[in-house]
Design a protein with these regions (language model features):
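Sequence/structural signature of beta-propeller domains
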Residues: 20-341
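Bacterial Sec-dependent N-terminal signal peptides
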Residues: 1-25
Length: 341
């Protein structure tokens, strides 16, 4: 009997070692990603002025886009042509809206679930993430089961982001800024690192996990900005379980000159262990747009999604900005791509 027990324990230890080896091998297979940021472009003759805040790929050249100030609840259909070799956007147009006669919920994030032919949209009004039919934009009556404690956000600082990955079958979202139950939020007069909660939901729309995420310290030195925002604008779920997080800092002085938007794309791996305070972050890339002298490429990027793969196998990340309806005829509805290898 003792020999049988010892043999069983030995076999169990071998199996555990093999399993641990598999885990380690899987972790090492997640190689570091690199990125190239393409030039931003805009198409004023074919893309109407908007407050575009989220984007998701439907396949081919089709994308669904949400606006946080659309007249009705629903989404726009965009056609975006991308060069298969460079990933640069060559043309884009939008001439269709799908939705119904409900008021807009300050729609911010959007995700496509192909197996169900449905769209999920996060709205900061009520902090609910509702499901819509792709063919007509009507609500299905289903929504992600967000715990009440995570819906209690500061005004206009709720669920700005949303992503779904068909391989992992997981939804991801995070509040734009710190939840009241977690303390103070970063402002131009109270500079601090925002401590956020990255939330995960399964394909049955149920909440499954939360992960601590700590933003960078702001780069703005002044405390007198006329307009300021510091938070996570969007997330993008990758096939290997990692998540790209868009940290966005925006500053607009009273005289407008010197305005900037600083965007940082970080990669986090929720499956990693060993973190003490928050998930480990790896900077993928960063870029800055400004209004400075004669230069004006100011773009408040709020949405991003995975797009097609290029001929060389590189992954395209598509980004869209909020021009506030091309405010003062100065801002533009920019699109841009980031090529990930």
């Amino acid at each position: 009997m003792k020999k049988m027990i010892l043999s069983a324990l030995l076999a169990l230890s071998v199996n555990m070692a093999m399993a641990q080896g598999d885990v380690l091998q899987t972790a090492t297979m997640k190689r570091d990603l690199t990125a190239k940021v393409n030039e931003q472009v805009y198409f004023p003759e074919t893309v109407p002025p908007g407050n575009y805040s989220g984007i998701t790929w439907l396949g081919g050249s089709l994308y669904a886009v949400v606006s946080d100030k659309s007249k009705r609840d629903g989404f726009f259909i965009f056609h975006i042509n991308i060069d298969p070799d460079t990933g640069q956007i060559s043309h884009a147009y939008s001439n269709e809206f799908r939705g119904e006669d409900y008021a807009c919920r300050d729609n911010e994030g959007i995700a496509f679930v192909a197996q169900d032919s449905t769209i999920f949209i996060s709205g900061e009004t009520g902090n609910r993430i509702l499901e819509y039919r792709l063919d007509n934009g009507h609500r299905t009556g289903r929504e992600l089961a967000v715990p009440d404690s995570f819906r209690q956000s500061r005004p206009n600082l709720g669920f700005e982001s949303l992503s779904y990955n068909p391989v992992t079958r997981r939804f991801w979202t995070v509040s734009e800024s710190v939840l009241p139950m977690d303390g103070e939020a970063c402002t131009q007069k109270n500079k601090k690192q925002n401590n956020l909660r990255l939330l995960c939901f399964d394909e049955n729309l149920q909440f499954v996990a939360e992960y601590p995420y700590l933003m960078d310290y702001p780069v703005l030195k002044s405390k007198t900005a006329n307009g300021y925002a510091m938070g996570v604008a969007d997330v993008c779920a990758l096939d290997d379980g990692r998540v790209i997080v868009l940290e966005r800092e925006l500053s607009v002085p009273k005289m407008k000159l010197g305005s900037f938007v600083n965007c940082k794309l970080y990669v986090v791996d929720p499956s990693e262990e060993g973190y003490s305070v928050a998930l480990h972050k790896k900077l993928l890339t960063q870029f800055k747009t400004v209004i400075k002298g004669v230069k004006n490429d100011f773009a408040n990027y709020e949405g991003m999604c995975l797009g097609p793969k290029l001929n060389d196998g590189s992954q395209v990340l598509v980004m869209i900005c909020d021009s506030q309806d091309q405010k003062a005829n100065v801002l533009h509805d920019y699109l841009r791509t980031v090529i990930i290898k």
